[in-house]
Structure formats: C-alpha cells, structure tokens
Amino acid sequence: MRTERTSFLLALGLLVSGFCSRVHCLPENVTPEEQHKGTSVDGHSLASSNTDFALSLYKQLALKDPNKNVIFSPLSISIALAFLSLGAHDHTVTEILEGLKFNLTETPETEIHQGFQHLLQTFNQPSNQLQLSVGNAMFASEELKLLDKFRKDAEAFYASEVLSTNFKDSEAAVKLINEYVKNKTHGKIEKLFNDLDVLTNLILLNYIFFKAQWKTPFNPNHTYESEFHVSQNERVIVPMMTLYLETPYFRDEELGCTLVELTYTSNDSALFILPDEGKMQDLEAKLTPETLTRWRSSLQPRLIHRLRLPRFSISSHYQLKDILSQLGIKKIFTSDAGFSGITDDHKLAVSHVIHKAVLDVGEEGTEGAAVTAVVMATSSLLHTLTVSFNRPFLLSIFCKETQSIIFWGKVTNPKEA
C-alpha cells in the first residue's frame, strides 16, 4: 500500500518530506533543565567533533568544484542537524550524530544537545565588541501537530520559536520565511527560497549573523588595485588591502603553506592560510583537526612589514543532500527515516538540505551570515617579512571562547561574488 508523503524542510537550511517511526528525544521523566544541571558538557569534545565535521564537509565541497570559491558555516549546519536529531530515533538519530562526528559511546545524546544549548547561550551573550547572533526557528504547517515533548526540547535546547505557516499558499509562505531570514541576517541573505514544494509541512531553520571589527584595521587609503593569480593562466584585478602589523604567524614547511591570524576587537580571529603555488589540493587532502590544532599552537607573534590581503565578498548556495549522504547521513532522506518524535500524525523524511552563506572581508573587519593562540619571536626583527595573499587561499573564522569554526572557506577568485 502506497503511503502519502509530506514534506519537511530544514533550512540552515534543511528541507524534509514525509515518513515515520518512534522518535527518541529525551527520557520522559527528566526535563532539559534538570539534565543541564546534572551533567557537565565537555566543550572541547563538542568543538573537536564540529571541527572534524567542518573539514570533512569542506573536502567534499572543494572536490565537487575545485576551482570555485567555497564559503559555509559548519556551525550552522551542525546545529540544524543536531536540532533535527531531537525528533529522530534508533538508527536515524545514530546516523545523524555519528555523521556529525560524535562518538556516542563517549558522549551521550543528551550531552550533545546540552553542548549545543551552552554554545547558543554563549554566542548570544550581548557584546560591544562583536555582533554574533545564532538562532533556530520552526515554520510548521497549520495542520501539523507537533508533539509537546519535541516543542519543549526544541525550545529548551535550541531556543527555537514556532511560526504557524500556511504552506498551501506557497507564495505567502516563501515571503514569510525569506523576510524572517533577511531580518535575522541583517539583510545579508535576502532570499533563501524561490518556491516551496506543495508537500512542505515543516521547516527547521538555523541562522547565523557575524560582524566584527579588526583589532588593527586596514587603512582604506592604502588599498590599491593589484593582480590576483586565480590560476597559472588567469589573473584578475582586485582591491588589495595592505597593513604593517605584528600578528600571529606560522610558516609550515612540512605542508608548504603560510599562516597569518588577524584578531578582532572581540579577540575572536580569522586565520588565513596561503598554500605555496600549486599546492592547494595537496594541502586540502592533508587537512585534519590535528593539523588545525598544530597550526594554532605554532602561531607566534611576528612583525609583518607588508601584509597584502584582497578585499572580497563571496557567497554560496548549496544543496547538501548528496554530500551529507557521502558523509554517512543517508537514512533521513529515505522512507526508513524515523521522525515520529516530531509528530505522530505524519510520516516524515528529509527531501533537501539547503545552506546559504555570505562573507564580506574589508578594511574595517568581517561581516558574514549563514542560514544551515604566544611568545614573542626574537627572529621577527631580523629581516623584513611580506605576505601576499595574491593567489587562492583558505580562511577560517574562529570563536576562541567556544573553540568553534563559525565560517570556513576558500577564496579562488575574489572577483566572483
């Protein structure tokens, strides 16, 4: 007998469509607040898993189109998928959380949700030095009856609000969601959806907005037009920012790359990674969480007499279904998906996972949105040092307090928005 399918969307994005089974959320006799009081969450473990997932996802995105810019928020995608797992059970929840690189024998499911709860609370603390807001929302069909437990867990762990939505009026639903996203990302992402499937029943959405000022800003008067080597055969003219400063620096001879860390007034940072010419793919293949840890511990203050960095604005729009499947998160897209912890009157499965991100880097600082370390080196004064990011490079926007990668990307052509 054929089962009618409905659609459920995770927009970070994640887009989901109909199926069922019993969903495990949290033990019935324990509230999220009681569990949060009783258990200490290992923030390092959460950060380590998020970093592992970020690099695994990046390698798949880079492999898909090696010569294109890449920008995404691994944190947004991790939060959205963890949020989804609240309503999953058995093999479905295991597949999601293991796909996010969690070891469930070492970190129980409830501790993972507590970890994300703490992360969200930390990110959303008011600050004069940093604009960082991270949040979740559910756009639920007027006919869909969400289970009380899922509603409560979603609010307690992921601070998710619920917005009743008439998906039968697709145009109005698209307008509602796009305006919500535009507002939450301060206009950086104006449109997440052009249209919606008629079977859409539920949208789980995660957004991130980040804006920070450099501790040592670039002088706009020193920005000039310069060549950027996209490839051996292609060059483009870009606005090249320049700066004289002392900042954390590391030259990795083993992997053939140069690293420069620029800090924000909030003490969060951007790490720029410049592979030697022709070494980008070799470096990408060797990226591991251990590599990032080694780099951060190796950074030393160094006087850079001339740092050259292009001013750029890049964006992305990814359909992540195939890539997540390659990372082991497959069941959520099939009729075997178990999401009866969300509702008991619809069968749900994920139909799409959508992620959109925008990142601007300029003289004053960095602005981005997504929806899914030191000892003075005495040798620094022995010779002048120039570092020119005039060829493809990697970047990581990093929150030091939570040890989280907020954005990860690759700039192959600063002229391509």
UniProtKB/Swiss-Prot annotation:
Gene3D superfamilies: Alpha-1-antitrypsin, domain 1 (2.30.39.10), Antithrombin, subunit I, domain 2 (3.30.497.10)
Keyword Glycoprotein recorded: yes
Cross-referenced CDD domains: serpinA3_A1AC
Location(s), subcellular: Cytoplasmic vesicle, Secretory vesicle, Chromaffin granule; Secreted
Entries under SMART domains matching the protein: SERPIN
Gene Ontology cellular-component annotations: chromaffin granule; cytoplasmic vesicle; extracellular space
Protein name: Serpin A3-7
Organism annotation: Bos taurus (Bovine)
